[in-house]
Each structure stands twice: as C-alpha cells, then as structure tokens.
C-alpha cells in the first residue's frame, strides 16, 4: 500500500478507488463486493496529511473482509459501504478533496459511470489502470516464491498426464488427470485474465485433427474444446 501511494503521488493523482476483483485480492487480501480507497502519499485522506489512510468499503461480506484482511492486524480500515449519494461526503470527511482515480481499463463502463457520478462533487476521476499495472508487473519476493511453487505443481500435472496417457484416452480425460493434481494443491478452478473477453482454462490438451483447429485465444494452442457434439 505505501508503494502504491507513492506511485499515485508521482503520477499526480490524489488517490485511487480499486474495484477489480483481482486487485482487491492483491491490495485488500480478499475479493468481497467492495471498493478500496487508497490515498496518494501526502494527499488528502493519507496518514501523512492527518487522515486515516486506506479504507475498504464493503457491501458484503463485511465479516469475511475483516477476516481476510487480518482482523485486528489489518493494515487498512474496513467499513460498511455507504449510500452512493453520500459517498463523496464520506470521503470528504476523511480529508479527501479531489476525486480518486478509477480503473476505467478494467471495470465495465456502466459500473464505473455510477462512481464517476457519485464522486463528481470532488472533481473528475482520472484513469489509474496503468498505475496499478506498473506495480503489479514488479513481483515481490513472496510472489516469486509462489510462482516457483506453482511451477512444481505444473510439473506434477505433466507427470499425471504421462501416467494415464495411452491409446483410446480422450483429451478431456488427460486434462482431468492434470487438473486433479492442480485442484488437490488448492487451485480454485478459474484463471482471471484482464484482457476482455479472454478466459483461460487451467489445462488444455489437443491432439490429432483437433490440434490443428485455431481458436480466439492468444496462444499457439487452439482445439475444438468441449462441446455437445
């Protein structure tokens, strides 16, 4: 959070309102139905300016958001989401005098428009999508450790495919063997991708004629995919 606050300050942005589920998980520790306000370093609402610092406004579940953020050891405030027409006033009482930036490159326009209107008394909301990406692209030591651990799981997935593979085994059966390893290690089953409208499966195995069929996915692997026929 301090690093992000510094990046906001360097970009000349007073603060950020984060709402993309993946980024809520990264900055707040969970992905409840919420919006997280992070003030720029030294800007209104920041601790340096006499404010209370970052705050997570939660619609539901407040109790789970507190738990996921560390409960009594939470590095930010966790509050009930106020009424939208009172949102700018709530932020103003926290010392915020300029509209925070929104993730226009991530969330649907109809969703962001609601916040643009609600925050309009504080001014125009800039786009902070690139600032978020700038921090997320630099992986922490912990993230690097998790990537190495994930690579070990991936290796065991390949070994599972090798163990069950043979004549007459379908591509879906091979994928199931690989994903069984992934799920047993705690994978939730979904890979979130920022680029709309891409989606990604944990395992894709293609062979024969199916292997030569292209798809919309930005990858060398296509295939027919699962279908009723």
Positions of PLM-derived features:
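A composition/biophysics-driven feature that prefers long, compositionally simple stretches
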Residues: 1-157, 171
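Short catalytic-site patches enriched in acidic/histidine residues
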Residues: 27-32, 129-132, 138, 171-229
């Amino acid at each position: 959070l301090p690093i992000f606050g510094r990046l906001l300050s360097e970009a000349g942005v007073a603060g950020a309102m984060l709402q993309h589920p993946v980024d809520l998980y990264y900055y707040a520790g969970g992905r409840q139905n919420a919006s997280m306000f992070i003030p720029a370093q030294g800007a209104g609402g920041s601790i340096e300016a006499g404010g209370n610092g970052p705050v997570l406004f939660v619609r539901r579940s407040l109790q789970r958001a507190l738990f996921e953020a560390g409960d009594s050891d939470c590095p930010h405030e966790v509050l009930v989401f106020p009424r939208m027409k009172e949102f700018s006033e709530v932020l103003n009482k926290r010392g915020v005098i300029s509209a925070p930036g929104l993730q226009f490159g991530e969330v649907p326009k109809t969703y962001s428009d609601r916040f643009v209107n609600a925050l309009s008394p504080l001014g125009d909301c800039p786009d902070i999508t690139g600032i978020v990406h700038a921090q997320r692209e630099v992986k922490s030591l912990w993230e690097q450790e998790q990537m190495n651990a994930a690579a070990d799981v991936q290796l065991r997935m390949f070994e599972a495919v090798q163990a069950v593979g043979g004549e007459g085994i379908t591509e879906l059966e091979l994928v199931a063997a690989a994903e069984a390893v992934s799920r047993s290690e705690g994978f939730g089953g979904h890979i979130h991708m920022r680029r709309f409208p891409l989606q990604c499966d944990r395992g894709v195995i293609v062979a024969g004629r199916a292997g030569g069929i292209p798809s919309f996915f930005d990858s060398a692997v296509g295939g027919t995919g699962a279908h009723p026929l």
